Regions:
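Conserved N-terminal catalytic core of the sugar/cofactor nucleotidyltransferase
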Residues: 33-97, 177-179
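Conserved alpha/beta core of the MobA/IspD/sugar-nucleotide pyrophosphorylase nucleotidyltransferase superfamily
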Residues: 2, 156-226
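Residue-level signal for inorganic ion chemistry
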Residues: 8, 32, 89, 103-104, ...
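Conserved beta-loop-beta/alpha segment of the NTase-like Rossmann-fold superfamily
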Residues: 74, 81-145, 159
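Short aromatic/basic micro-patch
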Residues: 25, 109, 149, 163, ...
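Residues at the starts of beta-strands that form the adenosine-phosphate
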Residues: 46-48, 127, 196
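Hydrophobic packing residues within well-ordered alpha-helices of enzyme cores
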Residues: 17, 60-61, 118, 169, ...
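N-terminal glycine-rich phosphate-binding loop and ensuing alpha1 helix
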Residues: 1-58
């Protein structure tokens, strides 16, 4: 497998949660411990870099030491947006890195198997993201009223880690910065560049913590897996 830098985006404001979801306890350990341990155990991950709030930098180093994380290379202060945080982390990656994986720190149940599978697809296609087929009906709306019903079979929800060829990713980030463009996720960055992104098979358990109900579900799922 190609050498992969695993970036954990953990500098968000957690405004919807009302508290720092990254360090919420799931069965006795911080939520972000899950991604750290999965990346540590993945054969394709060479180094881990965390983009964090300035007030959390030392806490991440302490957590890594407690968990026995040896791949952690840097903890950087994130920016105002996800893209700024990813760019700050990207600057710390080794020159020999061949793939860049960007993962939401608020997805605590990511597995080694998912990381390896998406990395393998990115190695083949240049860009890959884990995805799940949409299951709910999708409506386009305007001013609170339905405009049309979308063809659900053509839509997918995407997860992280999103993995990209390192050279392509660095180039895309540079172009976006020069153009003053800021994207909500890295897949959208590659869409802007016109590069196809492969949809890898996602994991229904790889949920994102956005509200209290997500924490309860994640805790239940993690109990089953231990």
């Amino acid at each position: 497998m190609k050498k992969t830098a695993f970036i954990i985006a953990a500098a968000g404001s957690a405004s919807r949660m009302g508290r720092d979801k990254i360090f919420i306890s799931l069965n006795g350990r911080p939520a972000v411990a899950g991604p750290l341990l999965a990346a540590q155990r993945s054969d394709c991950v060479t180094e881990i870099i965390i983009a964090a709030k300035q007030t959390d930098v030392l806490a991440f180093w302490d957590l890594a030491k407690t968990l026995g994380i040896t791949k952690l290379k840097a903890v950087v202060t994130g920016g105002k947006t996800r893209q700024e945080s990813a760019a700050a982390a990207l600057e710390q990656t080794d020159a020999e890195i061949e793939l860049i994986a960007v993962h939401d720190g608020a997805r605590p149940l990511v597995t080694v198997e998912l990381i390896n599978a998406v990395c393998a697809d990115a190695e083949k296609y240049g860009a890959a993201v884990p995805s799940l087929a949409a299951t709910d009906s999708l409506k386009e709306a305007r001013d609170g009223f339905v405009v049309r019903t979308a063809d659900r079979d053509r839509f997918f929800t995407v997860q992280t880690p999103q993995v990209f060829d390192a050279g392509l990713y660095r180039g895309a980030m540079s172009v976006a910065a020069s153009a003053g463009m800021d994207f909500r996720d890295d897949c959208q960055l590659f869409e802007f560049m016109g590069h196809p992104v492969f949809l890898s098979k996602g994991d229904p358990h790889n949920i994102k913590l956005t509200g209290p109900i997500d924490v309860a579900v994640a805790e239940m799922l993690s109990e089953r897996e231990t």
